[in-house]
Amino acid sequence: TDDAQHDWLNANVSLYRRMPADLQEALRVMIPEFIGKVRWRGEEGFMITEEMKVCIAAEACIPVLKLRGGMEIYRRFESIEIFPEDLSKVNGRGVAGDANGRRVRLGWRWAKEGMNDGEDGYNLVIHEFAHIIDFASLDGKADGVPQFNSYSETRDWEKFVAQNYEDFQRELGRNNESFDDYGSSNEAEFFACATESFYERGAQFNQEWPESY
């Protein structure tokens, strides 16, 4: 029910608690559609509850809530696979999540941590769905240039990244508190990390990177 959704989101999703009531309501309208279009699969014996689905769906929908097209942006997206913790290890480090355009994989431990704290700049679900938005562009590539509301906005962002990305790589590790320097890995990761920061540390991000914001 809508009341149950509200209670679950209020208890688990910090970004939801910060939203005005009208946006909360608009988000709750999107959630059942998202849940219904996605194939959900628990890995390594992980059991996915309805509450988990609602919370993940909410965070997946937040980035498209105000975009023209809304859920249509996820038209090619198909499935979510959830692991208890890390997906795998790479060079001794755990992989918390990944995305390939049609599928997202999430480590629940890290997804839950990102939901609960809406001000630390870390949000695994939003990060991975920023990649899905990126993949949904006309070229089908995750290259840090998603499809914006208009062609001119898309071109402006493409030019901005082309002109400034080397500066991002140099500066991300220096006195930067608004988002993870993992964003300097490539243009796609910059877009995903910037999207996390836009929602989690908006004021700080705007102060440090006003043009990107």
Describe the residue ranges of each PLM region.
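N-terminal topogenic membrane-targeting module
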Residues: 1-36, 41
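Active-site recognition of the HExxH zinc-binding catalytic motif
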Residues: 20, 120-137, 192
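Generic beta-strand structural signal
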Residues: 78-79, 102-104, 122
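Short, charged early-sequence alpha-helical segments and their helix-coil boundaries
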Residues: 42-53
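Metalloprotease/metallohydrolase-associated module, dominated by Zn2+-dependent proteases
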Residues: 35, 39, 54-74, 85-116, ...
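Hydrophobic (often cysteine-bearing) scaffold residues that line and stabilize catalytic clefts
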Residues: 23, 52, 118-122, 188
